[in-house]
Amino acid sequence: VDICPVGALTSTDFRFKMRVWFLKQSNSLDTESSVGANTVAWSREGVLYRVTPRRNDDVNDTWMSDSGRMLYKLVGAEDRLGKITVEGSHSTLESAINTAVILIKEGDVAVVGSGRSTVEEQFLTKKLADAASASASLVSRVGEGDGILISADRNPNVRGALVTGFISALPEQQLTALAADVDADKVKTIISVGEDLTVAGLSAEQLAK
């Protein structure tokens, strides 16, 4: 869909959904892997409609992976958290923060950061972990790379976590050590930043403790 000079060939995923001239363009990066392909995010009124490649001769030229184009759908996914809850009930932001502060003060805290976070977010995540005297973990994602547009490291910013000092070594794909600490009652509160812990090796039963 990027090779048609007159726009006669278009993506079926985007076709007829929104007039292009209504959309706001924001420069971004592909979050599929650590390649960091340059992209443009097209949105209107807070809704993301598509992602297209942005030229960078040193990284991705004028291309991006097909799978990377579809990642925008995760933003509006039905199973994504869309409201603030405490113990399964709707809550205000202030109440949720107060509850979190109480739990952090009780100690035995672990912080799970994300390799999808920006450097600034990882810096703040480290500050939070340090303030809470918490252990720090990061979830690794590994997949097949093509050597061009997709790397085997499927996290876009593990390097940022290393640079900020949030972690000191490359992460594992499963949070085995954290799961063991939960079972041994060494960890009573987990702060997860943008990660689904059930995918990273913790069971629903462990998280309910």
Per-range role (PLM):
Residues 1, 10-209:
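Catalytic alpha/large subunits of respiratory electron-transfer oxidoreductases
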